[in-house]
Amino acid sequence: MPIITLPDGSQRQFDNPVSVLEVAQSIGSGLAKATIAGRVNGERRDASDMISEDANLEIITAKDEDGLEIIRHSTAHLLGHAIKQLFPNVKMAIGPTIDNGFYYDIDLDRSLTQEDIDTLEKRMLELAKTNYDVIKKRVSWQEARDTFESRAEPYKIAILDENIAKDDQPALYHHEEYIDMCRGPHVPNMRFCHHFKLMKVAGAYWRGNSDNKMLQRIYGTAWADKKQLADYLHRLEEAAKRDHRKIGKALDLYHMQEEAPGMVFWHNDGWTIFRELETFVRTKLKEYDYQEVKGPFMMDRVLWERTGHWQNYADLMFTTQSENREYAIKPMNCPGHVQIFNQGLKSYRDLPIRMAEFGSCHRNEPSGSLHGLMRVRGFTQDDAHIFCTEDQIESEVTSCIKMVYDIYSTFGFTDIFVKLSTRPEKRIGEDVMWDRAEQGLANALKHNGLEYEIQEGEGAFYGPKIEFALRDCLDREWQCGTIQLDFALPGRLDATYVAEDNARRTPVMIHRAILGSIERFIGIITEEYAGFFPTWLAPIQAVVMNITDSQADYVQKVVKQFSEAGLRVKADIRNEKVGFKIREHTLRRVPYMLVCGDKEIVENKIAVRTRKGTDLGTFSVEEFVEILKQQVRKRELTLLGE
C-alpha cells in the first residue's frame, strides 16, 4: 500500500503498486493528459513505471525543463523510427539530447542529401501525428542482445557488450515496429513530439575516436509547442545575421587563413576594438589595486612538469626545441606569475598581491573545433593571479566577484549565471586540499547572496572554479569569467611568504579572468551588438562629409578638432553624392554621420544624424565634441537620440 507524497505535501494512499500516470489520473484528467514522466524520490521515471513503496513524486510535464529534455530525447527515437522506414538497411548508433535539441548518429551506405532530410522530416511528422503509444519493456541483457542481433544493429550490440552489465535489465522502447534501447525516460505517447525540425547533417566518428568509422550525425531541434519552435528558429535566423564571422568580414575587423589555423590577423578597425577593451580593463585593474606584469611566451619543459601541466595538459600544448632543450609555448599564464612572485622575499604584510597580465596564450585545440573568434588556438587572456593567505580568500573572491559584475554591466550584460565546478577525475593535490578549496568558493558565493549551480567534475586539474556565463540578446549562454582557487601550484613551484610567526608558508593562489579570451569576447559582443558597437568601442566614431567640393576644407578643419580631442573621426570628401556616403557609412555601422554644407560653414556648425537614420539637427563643433567625449568617458551603450 504505497503512500505517495506530492510536492505540496499532500499524500495519496493506494492499495496496490501504482504507476506515475495512475497517480496523475487520481489527481485530475488534465494533469494525466499532460504527464510526460515523473520524478520519484528525485529520480526521473517513465509514466508507465510502477511505484510499489512509499515515495515522493513530482509529475513532469512539458512545462518543466526535464519534460522538454524528454521530448527531445523521444524525438530522437522518432527520427530513428522514420529513418528505418525510409532506409531499412541503416545501422543506428546513438541518439542523445543536446542543448535545444538532439542528434542521431547513423551508419548509411550513402551520404544524406537535403532532399533526404526534407523527406525524413515529413515522415517523422506523419508518424508523430498518429499519436501512437511508446511501450517500454525491461528485458534481460541477452534478450536485448538477441533483439539487436536479429535486427542487424552492430552499434547497439557494441553498447550492450561494452557498457551494460550482463546482470542488468536494459529498457527497450517500442515505437510501433521500431525498437530502441535507452535509459529513458521517454514520452508515453507521440502526441508530445509534434514540434521539431531537422537542422543539418555532419560527420562524427563512432565513440568520438578517429580510428573508428565515420558516421553521419543528423541534428534536430524539438520543442513543446509550435510557438517555442517558431521562436527558436527565429533566434537562429537572427543569430545567422549576427554571425561575428560575417560581420567581421563586412566591417573589415580581422581575418583568418589556412596557414595559421585558429590564429587571428587583426585589421586596423578590429585591433582598435581590441585595444579599447584592454584600456577599459586597465582602468579597472587600477581601481581594484592590481599590478600589471608580462611573462615570457614560452618556458622550459621542466617547469611545466613541476606544475603538472605536462602530465595533465600536454595534448593541448605547442612545443619547440632549441639547443637540446624542449620548450612549451604557454597555454596559460599562472606558472609565469608564480616565478614573478618568487623574486624577492615576501611577508604576510605584502599580501594580497594581485598580479594581472594580458597574456598571449596558445592551445593546440583540435582543428575541427575551431570556430571564428569563439574557438581559437592563439588568444589573449585578461588574466590575473592573486597571492593571499587562507584568511583572505573570502574577501579576495568577493572582490573578484564584484569586479566581474562591474565589468559585465558596462557591456549591458546583466543576466549572469553562476556555476561552481568541482574536482575532476584527473587532478593534482590531495582530497583534503580540494575540500578546502571547494568550500572556500562556495562560502564566498553564499555570502554574496549569489545562486549557483554545481557542475560535478568540471573543475580544472589544479583546483575548483566559479564560472560566470552571460546570457545574450538571443538567449544564448557564453561562459567567460572564471575564479579558481588553487592550493597546489604555489607549493609545486616553491612559492612562500614569511608569516606573522616568522614561519615560511605557501600562499593560496586565486586565478581569475573576466573577459576570458579577448578574441572570444570580441566575437560575443560583435554578435550581441550585431556590429553596432557603442560609441566608445566603435573603430570610427563619426564620419565628417561634405556635400560639394566647396566644403572640403571645412570638413578637414572639423575632423582636426575632433581628432585633437582624442576621438576617432575621419573625413569623407569624395566626389560622391552625400546620400551615397551616408548609406555607405551606415552599412559600416559608424555611430554618427556629420554633414557639412554651406549653411553649416556660415554658422560654424555640423548637421548630425545617427546610423539608425535619426536626424539630430545641428550642433556647434565644440558642443558635439563634448557630447562624444562624454559618451566615450561614460562608456554609454546607446547613441544620442536613442
Curated annotation (Swiss-Prot):
Keywords assigned by UniProt, alphabetized: Aminoacyl-tRNA synthetase, ATP-binding, Cytoplasm, Ligase, Metal-binding, Nucleotide-binding, Protein biosynthesis, RNA-binding, tRNA-binding, Zinc
Record's cofactor remark: Binds 1 zinc ion per subunit.
EC numbers: 6.1.1.3
Subcellular location: Cytoplasm
Annotated InterPro entries: aa-tRNA-synt_IIb, aa-tRNA-synth_II, aa-tRNA-synth_II/BPL/LPL, Anticodon-bd, Anticodon-bd_dom_sf, Beta-grasp_dom_sf, TGS, TGS-like
Region span, Catalytic: 243-534
Classification via Pfam families: HGTP_anticodon (PF03129), TGS (PF02824), tRNA-synt_2b (PF00587), tRNA_SAD (PF07973)
GO molecular function: ATP binding; metal ion binding; threonine-tRNA ligase activity; tRNA binding
Signal peptide segment: none
Domain of life: Bacteria
GO cellular component terms attached to this protein's record: cytosol
GO BP terms in the entry: threonyl-tRNA aminoacylation
Keyword Acyltransferase set for record: no
Cofactor requirements of the protein: Zn(2+)
Role of this protein: Catalyzes the attachment of threonine to tRNA(Thr) in a two-step reaction: L-threonine is first activated by ATP to form Thr-AMP and then transferred to the acceptor end of tRNA(Thr). Also edits incorrectly charged L-seryl-tRNA(Thr).
Subunit text: Homodimer.
HAMAP family the UniProt entry points to: Thr_tRNA_synth (MF_00184)
Family affiliation: Belongs to the class-II aminoacyl-tRNA synthetase family.
Protein name: Threonine--tRNA ligase
The organism of origin for this protein: Histophilus somni (strain 129Pt)
